[in-house]
Structures are given as structure tokens and as C-alpha cells.
């Protein structure tokens, strides 16, 4: 059987899809169409009519999906869907997982007797680090020589809202067959990473000059200049802060507000950022979340509310 695959448009979503593709291929199945999805969710998600059997990973639940795996606490679009949801071997949700990639791997092994290649285990452990922000130090988090960091960066910046599915398809296919360390050396990955690397120093300088402190929270407006996104730069320059709020501009002229907590100095309040951003139709995890806006004015207003 051939399935349409819906996946979150980041490294975790792509890796989750790759593991599923390897599993499906072992049964003589595969993917038909590739659909990269992102937050905020369009209003028609609940009414979406799938034309083919569908798999969804690292994204919102939909009861019509044949397979669904996710680890986001904000996985259910409606209270009714959450109330009526039942865990099965085909539909599984566990917000305790740092990455959806690791969740998919574990469930396929346990419920379908999947025999994965050894490199999938290493992939899952690295996704726990990158998606769960559990690096051993700020130095490791900022080490762009690491293959996993380079892979993750290839989906960031101006590529975050990319509509061309070819790159996603290429990487999912490649990750399903070989180690992510080998995939990171592909010309397409390196081209994206090199573009990021060229702007790294100027981006660091921009962050150092433009980070604004509000007690234990830092704010940076990245929409005013074309800079590389540096998720941990605020904690690099100001290691004692608890939160960083980012305002970003995307290729489609939309804006987003991202909020993260310091992985090396967690705030005592333990505010759930993903749930907090649901008021703006966003989502995320305990320590990181994002919401999108049509205008900069709306994004700035939300950023100020978040900082308060």
C-alpha cells in the first residue's frame, strides 16, 4: 500500500518520516505524496479530506490518519478529539518523549516487530538532543561542526516555510537508507549549511548588539535584518536569563514569535510555553513554543504580552 505522509517541516518530522519509510518498505509499502506541514494550523485541518491512506508524524492528531505518532503536548486540535482518543499501535501519543523520531522508533519495534538498522538508534538519540534541547552545554549546542546540527540548520531560516517538497523528499529517502552522518554530507545539505555558515559571525554580532533584556527575559527582533537564526545565542551572551523571545519574518511575509527557556538555567515557574502560546493559535513543548502572525504589529503585540 502507498500512503501520503504528513510531517512537521523540521529535522524531527523528517527523521520520523524516514524511519516510517524504512519500516513500510520492509513490508512492501511506501509513500505516495509528501506533505510538509507547520504551525499555525489552517482552519480546515479538522475538515481535511485525505484522498489517499494517510500517515501523520510529529504533528497534530487527525482521526482519519491510518498511522499517527506525536510527542507535542498540544497535539489535539479540539477537546473532543482528545477526549475520544485511544492509544493503539497505529495511533500513539506520548508527550514524555523528547523527539517524535524516538517515539516512532520505539513503537514500531514494540508493536510491529520492526528490526531497524543500528544507525536509527543514533539518529533518535541525536533528535532527542536537538528537538528536546538537552545538550550537555552551550558549547555543544553552538557547535556547527556536528552533523546533527548541520542537518537541523538545513531546515531553518529562509527554508522554514519552503513550499518546494523536493528537498524534504530527498532527505527522507536518504535518511531511510543510511546514517544521518552520511546524509549530512550530501551536496544539497551542505549547500544550505554553507549559506548559514557564511552569515554566522555577522549574525552573532547582530544578536550581541540587539538583544534587549527585560529582567530575566531577552528579546530579539530578527525581522529587521536577514540573519541566521541562532536558537541559543541569547543564553550564550546572557547565561543567567530564563527566557528568550524571538520575532522572526518568513519568506511568505508572515511573522512568528518564538519563545524558549534556558536549557542550562530552567526557570522555577516551569510555565508550559507550548500551552501558553495556544492563545495565539501556536503550540510547542514545555520549554519551547511558536506562534505565527499575519502582520508585524500583531507579532510585536504578542511578544510584549509574552514578555510580561
Feature-to-residue mapping (PLM):
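Long, charge-rich alpha-helical interaction segments
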Residues: 152-191
Amino acid at each position: 500500500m502507498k500512503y501520503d505522509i504528513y510531517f512537521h517541516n523540521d529535522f524531527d518530522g523528517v527523521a520520523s518520516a524516514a524511519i516510517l519509510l524504512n519500516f513500510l518498505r520492509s513490508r512492501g509499502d511506501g509513500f505516495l505524496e509528501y506533505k510538509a506541514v507547520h504551525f499555525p494550523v489552517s482552519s480546515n485541518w479538522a475538515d481535511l479530506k485525505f484522498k489517499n491512506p494517510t500517515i501523520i508524524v510529529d504533528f497534530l492528531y487527525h482521526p482519519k490518519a491510518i498511522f499517527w505518532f506525536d510527542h507535542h503536548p498540544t497535539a489535539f486540535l479540539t477537546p473532543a478529539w482528545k477526549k475520544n482518543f485511544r492509544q493503539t499501535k497505529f495511533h500513539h501519543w506520548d508527550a514524555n518523549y523528547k523527539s517524535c523520531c524516538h517515539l516512532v522508533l520505539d513503537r514500531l519495534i514494540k508493536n510491529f516487530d520492526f528490526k531497524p538498522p543500528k544507525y536509527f538508534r543514533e539518529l533518535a538519540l541525536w533528535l532527542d538532543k536537538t528537538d528536546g534541547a538537552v545538550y550537555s552545554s552551550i558549547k555543544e549546542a553552538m557547535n556547527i561542526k556536528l552533523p546533527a546540527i548541520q542537518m537541523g540548520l538545513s531546515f531553518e531560516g529562509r527554508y522554514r516555510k519552503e513550499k518546494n517538497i523536493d528537498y524534504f523528499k530527498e532527505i527522507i529517502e536518504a535518511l531511510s537508507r543510511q546514517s544521518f552522518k552520511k546524509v549530512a554530507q550530501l551536496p544539497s545539505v551542505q549547500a544550505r549549511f554553507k549559506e548559514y555558515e557564511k552569515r554566522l559571525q555577522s549574525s552573532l554580532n547582530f544578536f550581541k548588539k540587539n538583544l534587549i533584556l527585560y529582567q530575566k527575559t531577552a528579546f530579539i527582533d530578527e525581522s529587521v535584518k536577514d540573519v541566521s537564526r541562532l536558537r541559543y545565542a541569547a543564553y550564550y551572551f546572557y547565561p543567567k536569563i530564563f527566557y528568550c523571545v524571538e520575532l522572526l519574518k518568513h519568506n511568505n511575509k508572515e511573522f512568528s514569535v518564538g519563545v524558549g527557556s534556558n536549557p542550562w538555567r530552567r526557570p522555577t515557574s516551569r510555565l508550559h510555553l507550548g500551552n501558553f502560546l495556544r492563545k495565539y493559535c501556536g503550540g510547542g513543548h514545555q520549554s519551547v513554543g511558536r506562534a505565527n502572525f499575519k502582520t508585524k504589529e500583531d507579532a510585536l503585540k504578542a511578544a510584549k504580552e509574552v514578555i510580561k
